[in-house]
């Protein structure tokens, strides 16, 4: 017994030669790569993993708040909120921006409610958009998995998680209980999807609805449908709400929309952004561009006049926006300068940014107060 204790003590105190340790590690890495393929394990610093490709949301402020210039490719994103808050509008805007840079997009319409006329108005090329209207949740997720594994589709929208009804529930009778069936379906599907999404660099966006938890006395009673799996697998979660209305005289022409980044694995989370969604037009890009350009000094305002590079471009907000629409080259140049200022690069710490902090709502609130 004493000899065994002495042997254990000698083993514990024995120092491992660093050179031998490095050789052992190299051998283990080589064995893993041989068994599972090249790239199955690597040092984080040896890759460009942090330089994540992004697709613009169509909102400059939201792109800046997301930290990388939009929604990350090769990841799962969840967008949720109350009814008529702008969830589908935001995802159609993402599709329009993705198509503009040559990406192939698909829309899995589980709600059977996509309006092609509205999608076209938002800039979506509906002739190039792939659309599926599945009969049940299993079919929708199988189609999604097949599109991801093909490697030929870059952006997939699933609208919505709440409409992914399990086949057993559809074939059953009204009033039958199917406790946890949809949650199990989502959990199984996401386990299958995650690795393929990363391998094919495909962006999959799930739209989700809000439900109320019964009997919650303290804290937020709201929850999303489909169980907890999506919360864990999503790299980005956006909470979108309608915060007010946009009026032209007495007529309501749009809605003020607030988006909170509830979760973000690719940049700092918990930022909030506000922008307008105009009915029949989508996100009011030029309105947002003018606000951000003024806040960051690219456009100056003196009294009611706006000026750019010393040249007056319009008296009042509406005239300045009209000038930006009539001069798309200048608007694009200003937008690129704003993006360069506000959006983090992979090697740049967040502390080095920025004159306008998108997490600080005061700049946005002041700007929108001026509009009113």
Curated annotation (Swiss-Prot):
InterPro entries: AAA+_ATPase (IPR003593), DNA_recomb/repair_RecA (IPR013765), DNA_recomb/repair_RecA_CS (IPR020584), P-loop_NTPase (IPR027417), RecA-like_C (IPR049261), RecA-like_N (IPR049428), RecA_ATP-bd (IPR020588), RecA_C_sf (IPR023400). ATP binds at residues 81-88. It is found in: Cytoplasm. GO terms for molecular function: ATP binding; ATP hydrolysis activity; ATP-dependent DNA damage sensor activity; damaged DNA binding; single-stranded DNA binding. One of its GO terms (cellular component) is cytosol. The keyword DNA damage applies. Belongs to the RecA family. Can catalyze the hydrolysis of ATP in the presence of single-stranded DNA, the ATP-dependent uptake of single-stranded DNA by duplex DNA, and the ATP-dependent hybridization of homologous single-stranded DNAs. It interacts with LexA causing its activation and leading to its autocatalytic cleavage. This is Protein RecA. The lineage of its organism: Bacteria, Pseudomonadati, Pseudomonadota, Gammaproteobacteria, Pasteurellales.
């Amino acid at each position: 017994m004493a000899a065994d204790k002495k042997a254990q003590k000698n083993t514990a105190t024995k120092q491992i030669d660093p050179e031998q340790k490095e050789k052992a590690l190299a051998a283990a890495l080589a064995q893993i790569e041989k068994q599972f393929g090249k790239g199955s394990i690597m040092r984080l610093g040896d890759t460009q993993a942090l330089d994540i490709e992004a697709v613009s949301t169509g909102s400059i402020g939201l792109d800046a708040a997301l930290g990388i210039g939009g929604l990350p490719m090769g990841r799962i994103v969840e967008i949720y909120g109350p009814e008529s808050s702008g969830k589908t509008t935001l995802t159609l805007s993402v599709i329009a921006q993705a198509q503009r840079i040559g990406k192939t997009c698909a829309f899995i319409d589980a709600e059977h409610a996509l309006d092609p006329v509205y999608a076209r108005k938002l800039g979506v090329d509906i002739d190039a958009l792939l659309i599926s209207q599945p009969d049940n949740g299993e079919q929708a997720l199988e189609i999604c998995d097949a599109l991801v594994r093909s490697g030929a589709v870059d952006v997939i929208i699933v609208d919505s998680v709440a409409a992914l009804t399990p086949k057993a529930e559809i074939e059953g009778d009204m009033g039958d209980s199917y406790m946890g069936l949809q949650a199990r379906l989502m959990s199984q599907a996401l386990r299958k999807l995650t690795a393929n999404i990363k391998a094919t660099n495909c962006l999959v966006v799930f739209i989700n609805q809000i439900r109320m938890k019964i009997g919650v006395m303290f804290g937020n009673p709201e929850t999303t449908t489909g169980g907890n799996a999506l919360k864990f697998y999503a790299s980005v979660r956006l909470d979108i709400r309608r915060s007010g209305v946009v009026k032209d005289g007495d007529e309501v022409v749009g809605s003020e929309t607030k988006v909170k980044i509830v979760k973000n694995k690719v940049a700092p989370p918990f930022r909030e952004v506000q922008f307008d969604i105009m009915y029949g037009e989508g996100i009011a890009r030029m309105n947002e561009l003018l606000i951000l350009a003024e806040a960051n000094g690219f456009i100056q305002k003196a009294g009611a006049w706006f000026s750019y590079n010393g040249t007056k471009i319009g008296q009042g907000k509406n005239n300045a926006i009209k000038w930006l629409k009539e001069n798309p080259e200048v608007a694009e140049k200003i937008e690129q300068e704003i993006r360069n200022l506000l959006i983090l690069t992979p090697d740049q710490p967040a502390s080095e940014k920025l004159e306008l902090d998108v997490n600080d709502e005061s700049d946005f609130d002041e700007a929108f107060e001026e509009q009113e």
